[in-house]
């Protein structure tokens, strides 16, 4: 009997608002990152961004049904990037489950990989006001002999770091991986890997780090402790930020919710979606990729008095359990097909963990210094007070590509 050997998959999402190849095989398609970038990357990336948004909504709906009264925070982009990279090593029904579950099925395999390459290239950015870092790493046992083609594609398409590791020394391997993730997320996500199962021969990690500043920062002097209404008869006290500004705002009568966008400096925007009282479930059930485009079409500039709670929440998810409920199971089973990673060993994903942290305050992300003020037209301000459960999306404007997705049920943590 062939002994099964485990792959570990760890995904770290961090937001500090203060983680059957039947198309042509195209063996030389990704020989150089430049060629990938030129190969329909932009068009494919926009299509992929829409599918990734749909996957994110589907994932939030699943998590919300399991935990109707809890906070949810995750990075759909981080999760889908890691599994897309892993799909380079999958075949047959194992590959098809990934394509179906992550909404890749309307695109060819190579279009998906070209799109991720383009997104990684565009999203990784650093300016004085904004820093986004999205990346991957493969920690491989020194004795594993992976297929060179898989390694080449993981490196050239996903820019994955390759780290040779001694999985016979599990304690030091665990420390090395946690040190790596902590470094990549600027010490925001620590101790990601709690343990490593014996028999593990490869661990795939994906991380995402985002730091930025609100285009117009909130004045800390305006922040006051106020009530947040979790449910009927239950409230918590939270520090509530306030600002009057000119914002894109809309109301969706079909889903009974108000939409407000607050931009960061650069090309990133936060969308806050506040359901009417008692309409949170209706809103969650109505989430789909088309709804985002609908909201964008409804938005118009308004002077708004906006109240936003300061936040610090952390979420950890067993993605093996969650994805299995979305029909992605073979990759975790002994009968899965990951022979494009290594034809000499039987492999399965033994563990998949996603951890994300959200911190939001007056300055934006990670407390960058600075200030700003808007010149506002003379009109009676609208009101948007996030004092009951709401949804939040952080997205890149150009695609648009959803980076983070949250349901804030209790901002006190």
UniProtKB/Swiss-Prot annotation:
Lineage: Eukaryota, Metazoa, Chordata, Craniata, Vertebrata
Domain of life per record: Eukaryota
Protein name: Serpin A12
Tissue specificity note: Expressed in visceral adipose tissues.
Origin species: Mus musculus
Region (Reactive center loop): 364-382
Keywords recorded for this protein, A-Z: Glycoprotein, Protease inhibitor, Secreted, Serine protease inhibitor, Signal
Regulation: Inhibition of KLK7 is enhanced by heparin.
Subunit details: Forms a stable complex with KLK7.
Biological process per Gene Ontology, one example term: positive regulation of phosphatidylinositol 3-kinase/protein kinase B signal transduction
């Amino acid at each position: 009997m062939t002994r099964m050997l485990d792959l570990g998959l760890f995904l770290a999402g961090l937001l500090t608002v203060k983680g059957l190849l039947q198309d042509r095989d195209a063996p030389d398609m990704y020989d150089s990152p430049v060629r990938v970038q030129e190969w329909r990357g932009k068009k494919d990336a926009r299509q992929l961004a829409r599918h990734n948004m749909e996957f994110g909504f589907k994932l939030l709906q699943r998590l919300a049904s399991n935990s109707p009264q809890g906070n949810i925070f995750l990075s759909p982009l981080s999760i889908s990037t890691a599994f897309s990279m892993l799909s380079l090593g999958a075949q047959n029904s194992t590959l098809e489950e990934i394509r179906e579950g992550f909404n890749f099925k309307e695109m060819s395999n190579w279009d998906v990989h070209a799109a991720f390459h383009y997104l990684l290239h565009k999203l990784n950015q650093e300016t004085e006001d904004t820093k986004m870092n999205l990346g991957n790493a493969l920690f491989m046992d020194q004795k594993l002999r992976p297929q060179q083609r898989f390694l080449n594609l993981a490196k050239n398409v996903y820019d994955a770091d390759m780290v040779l590791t001694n999985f016979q020394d599990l304690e030091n391997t665990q420390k090395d991986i946690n040190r790596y993730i902590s470094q990549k997320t600027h010490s925001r996500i620590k101790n990601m890997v709690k343990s490593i199962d014996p028999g593990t021969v490869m661990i795939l990690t994906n991380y995402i780090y985002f730091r930025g500043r609100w285009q117009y920062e909130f004045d800390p002097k305006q922040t006051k402790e106020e009530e947040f209404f979790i449910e009927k008869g239950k409230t918590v006290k939270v520090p509530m930020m306030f600002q009057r500004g000119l914002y894109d705002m809309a109301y969706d009568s079909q889903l009974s919710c108000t939409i407000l966008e607050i931009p960061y400096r650069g090309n990133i925007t936060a969308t806050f979606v506040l359901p009417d009282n008692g309409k949170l479930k209706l809103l969650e059930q109505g989430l789909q990729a088309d709804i985002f485009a609908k909201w964008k079409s409804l938005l118009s500039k308004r002077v708004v008095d906006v109240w936003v709670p300061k936040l610090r929440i952390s979420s950890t998810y067993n993605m093996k359990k969650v994805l299995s409920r979305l029909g992605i199971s073979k990759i975790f089973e002994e009968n899965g097909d990951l022979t494009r990673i290594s034809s000499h060993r039987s492999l399965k994903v033994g563990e998949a963990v996603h951890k994300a942290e959200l911190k939001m305050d007056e300055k934006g992300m990670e407390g960058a210094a600075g200030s700003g003020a808007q010149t506002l037209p003379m009109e009676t301000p609208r009101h948007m007070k996030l004092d009951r459960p709401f949804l939040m999306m952080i997205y890149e404007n150009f695609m648009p590509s959803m980076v983070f997705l949250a349901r804030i049920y209790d901002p006190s943590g």
